Amino acid sequence: PYGMMNFIDVREDDCYYVDKTHYIPLIENANKYFFYIRPRRFGKSLTISMLRHYYNILEADKFEKWYGDLYIGKHPTPERNSYLIIYLNFAVVNAELNSYQQSLDAHCNTEFNFFCDVYAQYLPEGIKEEMNKKKGAIEQLDYLYKECIKTNQQIYLFIDEYDHFTNKILSEPACLEDYKSETHGTGYLRSFFDTVKAGTDSTIKRCFVTGVSPVTMDDLTSGFNIGTNYSLSPEFNEMTGFNEEEVRAMLDYYATTCQFHHSTDELIEAMKPWYDNYCFSEKSYGGTTMYNSNMVLYFVDNYIRNGGYMPRNMVEENIRVDYNKLRMLIRKDKEFAHDASTIQTLVQQGYVTGELKTGFPAETVAEPDNFTSLLFYFGMLTISGTKRGKTLLTIPNQVVREQLYSYLLDTYNEANLRFDNWEKGELASAMAYRGDWKAYFDYIAECLHRYSSQRDKQKGEAYVHGFTLAMTAQNRFYRPISEQENQEGYADIFMFPLLDIYKDMLHSYI
């Protein structure tokens, strides 16, 4: 079901579940301190939920009920239901660095008290009261893992969205110095992860840490040299998200329980350009690509609620990268070379090349390979092979393309860009249904003239091409495709009509 992240709710309510439990043995055989980066809304939280309950020592009696019909129910691992679980979700921690310590302490204290309550039978008597006498998350965690030695218990630590506060750094450059003080040397965040590291020599036997960016990982864990980042590993390429086989199986199932007016093949044809084509490992390129699981569930949910008709809006609003964050990324992009902007190059030639980094400090995000890597981890780029010894990266699908083209307008003029959305929408409708294309493109030409700087104009055709792509990407009736191949060669821009959604539309354009 769309929006559910609690594994137990999914299982107790007998919801449809895409079985990912065959990754449990792989995780168990990997390094005990496991880092995993994926874009937002890609199934990370549900994965953590599934793992937490699988390893929870208190829930052994529920194993058959929750996991019995899944892969892991038939192939359990030696460590199932053998840990005390500490779960920290940094998404609930205030991202303002000046109040981060207080918020982190409060969240950890709540979770540590919960830990003491539910595992009281496995812990020394009075541990909760003594723990609460300690000051802050660092002292309390240090106390807890040392006390677990007395009862010979092992802890599995899960941290979801460990890099939540990085978003603040990327959107507000003034925060960078505060961030550096918190994540380096004796900073509070750095000290917290140092305490986690110390615990790994004791009773914290496993860690599973997720996020959307490797930036914080490099700053916080440069001394945490026992952990391994598996984000680019081919064996975990399909651990989150859905492959096409999984999407087809889901559609086939719902077609037997709900009213469908399209075949599975027709629905795949409609969804694939929008949600598919993620590849997270160079060694996996040419094999299975991944769909954004959140967007697939959004589509299926809307399709069923529409009585078996395509949703008008293929993009769920919450999937969009936060505007201020991406705007900050664009500014970073322009810092290192305005005329060699990664995003402009990506739009104009359809790809960029670089070396994907598994981590880098926040202050170096503007360096070309680091910036390209950041776009990749945010889900704005996908691996599409190699070129001249570097990783070839392209825009994965129409959802991302629509975002990049829209935000690209900000790279052309950081002053007050304001377009009349109502007027633009009316012109787009006339273009689609009456064939009145001239007024629509006259409007784009007027905007191009009005908002372009002299420096932009000197770029000639490449600038006009990029600006036009950015503007036409906001047309809800078409999907602009750059350099589309046809029998006569290549079209600069092909306006592909979205007939699956607007069946009565009559006009398409090159």
Name every feature range the model reports, one short phrase each.
Residues 99, 125-144:
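Short glycine-rich substrate-engagement loop in P-loop NTPases that contacts/grips substrate
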Residues 91, 160-161, 191, 196-200, ...:
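A short beta-strand-to-loop transition that corresponds to the Sensor-1 phosphate-sensing loop
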Residues 151-182:
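Conserved P-loop NTPase "ATPase switch" module shared by AAA+ and STAND
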